[in-house]
Amino acid sequence: MGMKALLPSLLGASAALLFTASFAHAAPPIPDSLKTGGFEVGCQAWTFHDFTLFEAIEKTAEVGAPTIEFIPNQKLSPEEPTVQFSHNSPKEVWDKVKAKLAEKHVTPVAYGVVGFSKDEAEARKIFEFAKYFGLQTINTEAVDAIDTFEPLVKEYDIKVGFHDHPKRPDHPEYRMWDPEYILSVVKDRDPRIGSCADTGHWVRSGLKPVDCIRILKGHIVSSHMKDLNVPLPSGHDVPWGQGVSDVKGILDEYKAQGFEGPISIEYEYNWGKNVPDAKLCMDFRRAYGK
């Protein structure tokens, strides 16, 4: 075969290799066993932050959610209320948590919102913690540490999502609420660095979640899902589908973009007695998938 005839084959092979290489570090697909209504949905432990982590795991199982997102520094258990759980805890504490998760058939998938140090050794502790528990995503607001943790994202193949809290009129320098700002931070970074889309905080900031999700298309790596009673900073959580956040529209847009999770139910109302409300959120998700 002459060089002219061979050239298209070589170019095709090179393109195939490049295509393969571009997906070489893609996160593995979410197991069907962790999906509800086509999405991976679980509870954010903050929903039960008035309780210990062991109790939060029990309540997550009671809700019928297969997954949980850890928060840093939650008290471990009723038996050990002075022990805190985080990436800085000794391994024996991690082992106890892993055993409790197995007992309740709950899978940890994310951790946050957690701060990142610019010190590589300190940042690595968070990734080692995530690796131990098999987490998919770490959620943070530490934009200033992105140069520190981006190499660790590549090394560990673990995603990092930038979380948004509401707009702060008294702190105009806070920009995490703005999806355009988040996009500017992540668009030229490793694709495993993206947005942890908190839909409720967007509503509290006067934004429509579906519009925000479209702005961040292809750059959402996790989500904290909320439906609020009113589109105001004072708005509080209601079961999905009963508020103003357009949860169906959010799920439709996630589905259109191919985003399957992790999605965390973060219910910040009826503290101490919100398991029934969280169950209704799971029911909405199941009905959506039918």
Regions found by a protein language model. Name each.
Residues 70-96:
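Glycine-rich, proline-tolerant flexible connector loops at the mouths of alpha/beta enzymes
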Residues 25-28, 94-95, 100-197, 203-207, ...:
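Active-site acidic/histidine proton-transfer and metal-coordination neighborhood
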Residues 76-83, 168-172, 204, 231-236:
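A short acidic, helix-capping loop that chelates divalent metal ions and anchors anionic groups
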Residues 9-22:
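Bacterial N-terminal signal peptides
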Residues 25-45, 49-67, 183-197, 203-290:
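Histidine-acidic metal/acid-base catalytic patches
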Residues 1-6:
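N-terminal secretory signal peptides that target proteins for export/translocation
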Residues 84-93, 118, 125, 173-181, ...:
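Alpha-helix N-cap and loop-to-helix initiation/capping positions
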Residues 69-79, 108-109, 113-117:
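Active-site-adjacent substrate/metal-binding segments within catalytic domains
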